[in-house]
Swiss-Prot record:
Similarity comment: family membership: Belongs to the bacterial ring-hydroxylating dioxygenase ferredoxin reductase family.
Top-level taxonomic group: Bacteria
Gene ablation phenotype (knockout): Cells lacking this gene are unable to grow on propane and to catalyze the oxidation of phenol to yield hydroquinone.
Record protein name field: Propane 2-monooxygenase, reductase component
Length: 346
């Protein structure tokens, strides 16, 4: 059995134990403590600060924590192993979420439907079998296990807690992706898929009132659609401006539902941002040619007075992070998911 150590978190006065064979983040999940996190792969800069203790970090992106930050004492808890008792300062946390998040659990589901949305994005709908329903928040994600293997991939939920027994995921088919071939040929209705989760902090915060600027691209539509569905269902009174980046009009989807959801939100706008061509643009939709982050920059002069949510391929996420920094958006007003895929792994 691995040695265990005590971890103390400041300024929230929470303590827990961690084994030397698990990351601090995984130990927190195991004990019902929901620390701020995103990708869980050391790529998305959810940093904390070491006040005292002996730790080591596994492989991580220097974009998330550069050498100077690491030397100063910053750590990524998803990659950090403790080898002594430690005191850690949490730099970005939600007190309501810390001890009140949805429990991490193993879930058994069966495929209910597989439906193409665009030439390279598929809707995968799953019926929850065990337990009978799952608890999660709009904007979170699950790990899906490749049937018959221990391999897994993270996908955001497009549905809301209003349907805890039916989950929908929007999955982009990358060449060489483990799920890509299965979605095209190999996965069938009724087949069992194991899940684990929910994870992620790209969720709406209780009591927050700032306008929401949502920036999406590709399968990053999923968590933003979940947020829109939730706002529409609950009547939450917050302005929402949704910018979706795609290459051409053929890459746009769910436009009718987005329009319907928007009608139920007091102050809502949707802009399709097409980087390659605006030919054959759909009627009744605001379409602008160009990169989505450039278009947001041109249209959101007061971005720092909004809460920014984004989920997209890694290059678009990096561009959105740079945009938020350029506009001096406070870190606690930025929420995002940054998943990797075979197309972007280095």
């Amino acid at each position: 059995m691995a040695d265990t150590h005590k971890i103390s978190f400041e300024p929230v006065d929470i303590e827990m134990e961690v084994g030397e064979d698990e990351t601090i983040l995984d130990a927190a999940f195991r004990q019902g403590i929901h620390l701020m996190h995103g990708c869980r792969e050391g790529r998305c800069s959810c940093k904390s600060y070491m006040l005292e203790g002996d730790v080591q970090m596994d492989d991580y992106s220097t974009f998330a924590c550069n050498d100077a930050e690491e030397a100063e004492g910053y750590v990524l808890l998803c990659r950090t192993y403790a080898y002594s008792d430690c005191e850690i300062e949490l730099l970005n946390f939600d007190e309501d979420e810390l001890l009140g998040g949805a429990p991490i659990q193993d879930v058994t589901t069966k495929v209910a439907a597989i439906e193409p949305m665009t030439p390279d994005i598929v809707s995968l709908k799953l019926d929850v079998v065990e337990p009978e329903s799952v608890e999660f928040k709009s904007g979170q994600y699950f790990d899906l296990f490749i049937p018959g293997t221990e391999d897994k991939r993270s996908f955001s939920i497009a549905t809301t807690p209003a349907t805890p027994d039916r989950l929908e995921f929007l999955i982009k088919k990358y060449p060489g992706g483990l799920f890509a071939g299965m979605l095209t040929d190999g996965l069938s209705v009724g087949q069992e898929i194991k899940l684990n989760g929910p994870y992620g902090s790209c969720t709406l915060r209780n009591g927050h009132v700032l306008p929401i600027v949502a920036i999406g691209g590709g399968a990053g539509m999923a968590p933003l659609l979940s947020l829109l569905r939730h706002i529409s269902e609950t009547g939450l009174n917050r302005p929402v401006r949704f910018y979706y980046g795609a290459r051409t009009a053929a890459d746009l989807f769910l436009l009718d539902e987005i329009a319907t959801l928007g009608e139920k939100i007091d102050d809502f706008s949707f802009t399709a941002c097409l980087s390659e061509s605006t030919d054959n643009a759909p009627e009744g939709v605001t379409v602008i040619g160009g990169n989505v982050t450039d278009i947001v920059n041109d249209n959101e002069a007061d971005l720092a007075r909004t809460e920014v949510y984004f989920c997209a391929p890694p290059p678009m996420v990096d561009a959105a992070l740079a945009l938020a920094e350029q506009h001096s958006v406070p870190h606690d007003q930025i929420f995002y998911d940054k998943f990797t895929s075979p197309a972007f792994d280095s």
